Structure formats: C-alpha cells, structure tokens
Amino acid sequence: LLEHTKKIEAVEEVPLLEALGRILAEDAVATFDNPPFDRSPLDGYAFAASGTKGAQKEAPASFRIIGEECAGDFFAQEVPEGAAVRLMTGAAIPKGCDCVVRQEDVTVQDECILVPYELHHHENYCFAGEDVRKGTLAVKRGTELTAAHLGVLASLGLGTVKVRRRPRIAIASTGDELVLPGEPLRPGKIYNSNLYVLAGRLRELGFGPEVLGILPDDAAKAASFIAGWREKVDLFLTTGGVSVGKKDIMHEVVRRIGTRLFWRVCIKPGAPVIAYTAGDMLGIALSGNPFASYATFELLTRPVLAALAGRSDVAYRAAEGFLADAFPKPSYGRRFIRAHYADGIFSIPAQHDSGSLFSAAGCNALIDIPAGTEPLVAGTRVKGVLL
C-alpha cells in the first residue's frame, strides 16, 4: 500500500493559527537571535556589578536611579558607573549594565537604591539568542505542527507558514440494507454505523473527509459514482461489498474504474480488503463488518494517511503488556483483538466478534496474536498496537 501511496507534494501558505496539525513544508530557520537583545529575567534594577564590590548590609552600595524601562521600551543612553535603571521583567538591559538586582532586595532612598550585597558579572542576566540563535533550525520540514510549534514559529516572526496540502479523502458505505441514523428503520434494514466510526476517526486524526453516504448494491452505479471522484480526492474509502456474496460489488467496481493491487490480507478480522488505484486516486475497500472495518482502518489505512500527509514516521505506536483476561480461541492465522490498555495491562471485553461494535467503545488498543497461537491464559505477555 505504501508503495502506491503518493505523498502529497502540493504546498499552500496558511495563516499561522490555521497551521495546527498541518505538516510543515519547509524548514523554519531563525533569522535573528531570540530573544533579540539581552534582557532582564525579573523586576529589578540594572547597573555595573563592579559598583557593588564590598557591599554589605551595614555598608550598602548606592546607585542613582536615572530611568525606568518596561518590556517593549528601549533605554537608548549608556548607563554610567554609579547609576542604575529600573527594569521590568523582559526589558532590554541597557548598555553599561551587566547585572540586575531584585527590586525586593534593595532600599530606595532619595532617588537612589541601596544594594546590601555584592553582585557578579551577568548575574540575573538573560543573553540575546539564549532561546534560539540566528541560523538555528527551529522546526524541521515534515514536522506535524503542535501548539508548541506554533509558539516557536510565532517567536520567529512568522505570520504565515508553508504546509503540505491536506489529503483529500472521501468515504462511503455500500449496501442496500443500510439506512442513515435518523431515518425510520424498516424491516430488513440496519443503521449505517461504519460511516460514522470511520468519518469520526478520520477527524480525530486531523483529516476532514467528504462523507458521501450510502452507495447502492449496483456495481455500474457505484463505479460511476466513485469514478467521478478520481480527480477530486487522493483516497477513497468504502465499507462493505468486498467478500464473495451476490452483492459484494466492489470487485466489479474496481474492474470498471481502475487496477486492483490486492484482495484479502492474512489477518483476522477484516481479511477481505481490496486495495486499488484509479488514476492518481488510491482506493481502499474495507469489510462491512463493523469491528473488522475499524481494525483494518487502523492497521492499513492509518499508515497510508500518514504517508499521504508527508509525515516522516508512519510506524504504529506499539505496546507490550500482560493479559488481564484469558482469550479462549486458538488463532490459526494472525489475529487482532480489541482491548483496553493501561499501565502495562491489556483487558479484553467479553464480546470480540468482528460484527460487534459495542464492545469496541472504551477500547484503545489491538492485541496482535501471531498465527499458530493456542488459546491464551491470563497473565500471558503480548504485543499490541495503540489506537
């Protein structure tokens, strides 16, 4: 799948506040020292430290106050020996000063401050470039931008940034038996839960899919509909129609519109998956069984999404731990079962049939059971994938 996934190269420039969760398209390099000047880390007074030599409580050093500077101000003149400037936190340290004393440590008397102890060169002193030096790579190309990254980019003075275009994704379900929530449930029908699970999961992962509803069990109509999206989306996801039944239409759909990459994968649940290409569009047709479609979405589609978006790491988040519960079935093929993972313990719900979705609520992991594994007893050490 990843070999046929074309990373999106298109770049767009967006306002910084709209870049959260986006993939940075070019390195962000500091063009100036940050902070751009020496500054005070506290409210106090700046002066030359040499003037405090020998100062003590009984014989404090005296400095004449010649000005005041808040953050954002700039004291232009050089401060002579024996003089001090009052500074607020973040204010630039004036020329001629090499230390700052806390304002609560001094006594103000007759427009002078009395300093009761010696200070050293660069005491209470923040240097220009202490956070980031000019020329430093601040945020690397390919980084998924978090709130902290936005703060770094803002500190570089960037109001806009270049990011990868978001993957364009469409999602639909197949099946004449499906109705949308909110509609009357007629005899023989079921509500379409798959569409909502996968659309919601896509949004949780930061992707905004086009949710296209339900396609009929008619290969010609479904093929025509999906083909109409070939130039509009990078990835088309469907659920249902992938097994060998009379109305499993996705085989014929793929023959009509594109090239099949594979059908079936050696895992349970969700083995009957079809992957295909149609022009530049990649298609993944997942099982119609609710948990099977959810599991194969996580295992197969999620890495594709990461690759499309240009993320540098598409690996699963792996975990190891111990079973809190027994799993009574042998696994002749590789099997993934839902679980809740916390503090190194995997807890398995009582219901784990591929057609059941209810027990998936509250689960945050899939346990990976190798092929040829006998039933598992509680306490067995296992590996899993975190969702």
Where are these regions (language model features)?
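Helix-rich terminal scaffold detector
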Residues: G159-L286, P290-T296
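Conserved active-site and cofactor/substrate-binding residues in soluble primary-metabolism enzymes
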Residues: V11-E18, L42, P60, V101, ...
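Structural signal for hydrophobic packing residues in well-ordered secondary-structure cores
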Residues: L2-E9, D27, I93, T136-T143, ...
